[in-house]
């Protein structure tokens, strides 16, 4: 279907080559004086935009009674720049379409003619590829006459290729005008790369200062006439800008060392990269030589490429290739030779057998070992308490044997709470001490605790009872809060500190139940104890479960006991401690936790009231 659509459009637009009526095309006559000394380049323009402007200007000058002529080209500027070229000999043969793979090159509306036929007249027609059927006059016909150049021996002939020196003054001459003695300074029309240069009307073009952008393809036109007709003489000159000669010897950029480590039996590529300063009349030379004892020979080049080229210098690389490095190559010398008109430079390189990379493996192994040590150290630092508890689990040592003490720990807490806290049923220090501590430390791990409100019969002397209980305990656990430090129970902490200074087996553990500020009335020893004694922080719901970090730290400070009855429970809960702490809202609460209609509501209430109290 797509092919049929193209065929239909081709017939509608009248794109058939045969029968193309070019009588309405704008006509130009050009003369090309061809020189037989070398291959010249000739250019034809297809400026349909200029034709459109000329017709529009002519139509604007008509009187109001005259009807304006139809615009010859109604397409956009982009459409008018995409043109198709045709050629026709003078004999009247049919038009021939110039394809893209023909000897004539097409670029941006220009046609480059490379192979002229002397003493011949050809017609070249161009028109847009995309046009409406009524644009029959949207075309340009150029009648080109090719003649050999006369007066070949005339002096000061302008070349079709001219060179300008950067940073200096210069001029561009029209080649066709230099040997035309019968033409006296005609008015010129100059083009550069297909664009009109309206500021230049004379020959030559004088330049006060030459820059890189001055190079390009220049076209010069001037008009000649006789009594019968007139025609345009055209010539093309290619202008190239160059810099001043750099009078320095070539510099070898690579190789930069005198030796190269290689592997025997492997292929090898040896590049020689050289920087040459610009020299107009000198050709750079790069060669590779091989020297062996008294013999020397040149090696064939595997590859040559130009790496960089500017108006000041150029970098060229020549490469040789060895299919296999042999033991004999280790005794040879490979010489890179570079030369210009100023002098030459050489670089000699020798091949050396590459040693085994034992050092690399040693370094890699050491680095891996160091990384392993650092990872192990970080693991031990983060899970040190868990590792210690694991060792205690399998260690047949019980430090409670023979110490003549009755309790593993004495728990001190505040049993006073404000009416506001009681109203919401918050998790108080008393609930933590009387419910959670027995469930975890006694029921799960087999420790024996002493709770004043549970295990001491009232009626004795309070101070004497406290001192007696602390002396019978291996540890002292103190739940700190604002009500504790500002209440009468702070005496128990003071008494324990005094006893710990005498009894080295008594160790004290502080639990920061919530944030508090030290009262000024605290004794000096108590203030100092708050700074030096180990402290474990209670974190609300995160600390409730027996596998939480809170209970792991408490067990770390508790005495070591060997109880086979509780070993399985301790190991199971201990392994949970290596995994990240989970959100305990989804876990089943301990039996000592207050129950409500649903477990989520009870635990959220505990977290909320705990934060409100502290």
UniProtKB/Swiss-Prot annotation:
Q: Does the keyword Transmembrane apply?
A: yes
Under SUPFAM superfamilies, the record lists: Immunoglobulin, Toll/Interleukin receptor TIR domain
* Gene3D superfamilies the record matches: Immunoglobulins (2.60.40.10), Toll/interleukin-1 receptor homology (TIR) domain (3.40.50.10140)
The TIR domain covers: 405-558
Entry's Pfam families? ig, Ig_6, TIR
Q: Cite the GO molecular-function annotations of the record.
A: coreceptor activity; interleukin-1 receptor activity; interleukin-18 receptor activity; NAD+ nucleosidase activity, cyclic ADP-ribose generating
Which residues act catalytically here? 492
**Entry's Gene Ontology cellular component terms:** interleukin-18 receptor complex
The record's subcellular location field reads: Cell membrane
**Catalytic activity annotation:** NAD(+) + H2O = ADP-D-ribose + nicotinamide + H(+)
Disulfide bridge positions per record: 46-126, 154-179, 174-220, 179-220, 272-336
Query: Which top EC class is named for this enzyme in its record?
Result: hydrolase
Record's PROSITE patterns? IG_LIKE, TIR
Q: Where is the signal peptide?
A: 1-19
**Segments traversing the membrane:** 357-377
Tell me the segments the record calls region Disordered: 59-78
Phenotype when inactivated? Impaired IL-18 signaling.
* Family annotation (InterPro entries): Ig-like_dom, Ig-like_dom_sf, Ig-like_fold, Ig_sub, IL-1_rcpt_fam, IL-1_rcpt_I/II-typ, IL-1RAcP-like_ig, Immunoglobulin_dom
Residues with glycosylation annotation = 21, 151, 227, 344
Q: Which residues lie on this side of the membrane: Cytoplasmic?
A: 378-614
Annotated Ig-like C2-type domain ranges read 148-234, 250-352
Cite a single GO BP annotation.
cell population proliferation
Q: What is known of its domains?
A: The TIR domain mediates NAD(+) hydrolase (NADase) activity. Self-association of TIR domains is required for NADase activity.
Q: What job does the chain carry out?
A: Within the IL18 receptor complex, does not mediate IL18-binding, but involved in IL18-dependent signal transduction, leading to NF-kappa-B and JNK activation. May play a role in IL18-mediated IFNG synthesis from T-helper 1 (Th1) cells.
Q: Which family does it belong to?
A: Belongs to the interleukin-1 receptor family.
Q: What is this protein called?
A: Interleukin-18 receptor accessory protein
Organism field = Mus musculus
Q: What is the lineage of its organism?
A: Eukaryota, Metazoa, Chordata, Craniata, Vertebrata
UniProt gene name: Il18rap
């Amino acid at each position: 279907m797509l092919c049929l659509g193209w065929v239909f459009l081709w017939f509608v637009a009248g794109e058939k080559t045969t029968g193309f009526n070019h009588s309405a095309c704008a006509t130009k006559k050009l003369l090309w004086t061809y020189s037989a000394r070398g291959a010249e380049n000739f250019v034809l323009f297809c400026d349909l935009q200029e034709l459109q402007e000329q017709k529009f200007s002519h139509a604007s000058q008509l009187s109001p009674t005259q009807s304006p002529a139809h615009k010859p080209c109604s397409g956009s500027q982009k459409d008018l720049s995409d043109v198709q070229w045709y050629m026709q000999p003078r004999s009247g043969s049919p038009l021939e379409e110039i394809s893209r793979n023909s000897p004539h090159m097409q670029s941006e509306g220009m046609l480059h003619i490379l192979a002229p036929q002397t003493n011949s007249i050809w017609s070249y027609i161009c028109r847009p590829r995309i046009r409406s059927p009524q644009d029959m006059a949207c075309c340009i016909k150029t009648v080109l006459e090719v003649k050999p150049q006369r007066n070949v021996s005339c002096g000061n002939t302008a070349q079709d290729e001219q060179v300008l020196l950067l940073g200096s003054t210069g001029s561009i001459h029209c080649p066709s005008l230099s040997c035309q003695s019968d033409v006296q300074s005609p008015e010129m029309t100059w083009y550069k790369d297909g664009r009109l240069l309206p500021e230049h009307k004379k020959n030559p073009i004088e330049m006060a200062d030459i820059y890189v952008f001055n190079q390009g393809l220049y076209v010069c036109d001037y008009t000649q006439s006789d009594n019968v007709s007139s025609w345009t003489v055209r010539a093309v000159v290619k202008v190239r800008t160059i810099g001043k000669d750099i009078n320095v010897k070539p510099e070898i950029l690579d190789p930069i060392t005198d030796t190269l480590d290689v592997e025997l039996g492997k292929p090898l590529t040896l590049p020689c990269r050289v920087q040459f300063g610009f020299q107009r009349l000198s050709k750079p030379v790069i060669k590779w030589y091989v020297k062996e004892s008294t013999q020397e020979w040149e090696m064939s080049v595997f590859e040559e490429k130009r790496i960089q080229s500017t108006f000041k210098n150029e970098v060229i690389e020549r490469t040789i290739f060895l299919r296999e490095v042999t033991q004999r190559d280790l005794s040879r010398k490979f010489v890179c030779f570079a030369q210009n008109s100023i002098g030459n430079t050489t670089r000699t390189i020798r091949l050396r057998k590459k040693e085994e990379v034992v050092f690399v493996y040693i370094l890699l192994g050491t680095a891996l070992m160091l990384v392993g040590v650092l990872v192990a150290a970080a693991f031990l630092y983060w899970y040190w308490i868990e590792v210690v508890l694991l060792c205690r689990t399998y260690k047949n040592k019980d430090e409670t044997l023979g110490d003549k003490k009755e309790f593993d720990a004495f728990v001190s807490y505040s049993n006073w709470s404000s009416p506001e806290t009681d109203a919401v049923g918050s998790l108080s220090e008393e609930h933590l001490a009387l419910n959670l501590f027995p469930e975890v430390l006694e029921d799960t791990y087999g420790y024996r605790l002493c709770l004043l409100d549970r295990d001491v019969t009232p009626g004795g002397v309070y101070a004497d009872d406290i001192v007696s209980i602390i002396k019978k305990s291996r540890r002292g656990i103190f739940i700190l809060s604002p009500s504790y430090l500002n209440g009468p129970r702070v005496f128990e902490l003071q008494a324990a500190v005094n006893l710990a200074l005498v009894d080295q087996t008594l160790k004290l553990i502080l639990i920061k139940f919530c944030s508090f500020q030290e009262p000024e009335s605290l004794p000096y020893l108590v203030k100092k104890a708050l700074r030096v004694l180990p402290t474990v922080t209670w974190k609300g719901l995160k600390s409730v479960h027996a596998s939480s970090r809170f209970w792991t730290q408490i067990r770390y400070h508790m005495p070591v006991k060997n109880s086979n009855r509780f070993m399985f429970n301790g190991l199971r809960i201990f392994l949970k401690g290596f995994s990240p702490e989970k959100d305990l809202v989804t876990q089943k609460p301990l039996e000592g936790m207050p129950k409500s209609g649903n477990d989520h509501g009870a635990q959220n209430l505990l977290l909320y009231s705990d934060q409100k109290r502290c």
